[in-house]
Amino acid sequence: MVSGHNPQDAEAKRQPFAQAAYGTVGLETLLSVLLSLHHAHGLDLATLIRTVTGHPARLLDIDGGTLRAGVCADFALVDLEAPWIVDADALQSKSKNAAIEGRKLQGKVEACFVNGQIIFDSKMEIKK
């Protein structure tokens, strides 16, 4: 499972349909959209997490997607219950075109760490 995240700035999207750049925000909404499968349909949480962590890492032959000694500590802190509404203007991506604009989601990333260093905190926005 991947986001297909391919953000485009407003000018690239403000073209006749056939000439407009393709792409939409996906990275910032992927986990919350997947969590909707957990909340609404009972998808096992461990399976969901493996789908976006360990499985892609193995497919790409990346030593990651897991928390274990000797592997970079890349992880997210998630509030599984936090409700929020997708507001493209509030997203951090350069793209403001969200296919799910206005959709109510449950579950929100509160912080992200790469190699053990915080790069995003929902209270303070992007660090790096």
State where each predicted segment sits.
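Catalytic pocket of metal/acid-base enzymes, prominently hydrolases
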Residues: 5, 128
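C-terminal cap of metal-dependent C-N hydrolases
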Residues: 16, 72-127
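Hydrophobic faces of well-ordered beta-strands that scaffold small-molecule active sites
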Residues: 1-3
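His/Asp/Glu-enriched, well-ordered alpha-helical/loop segment
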Residues: 6-82
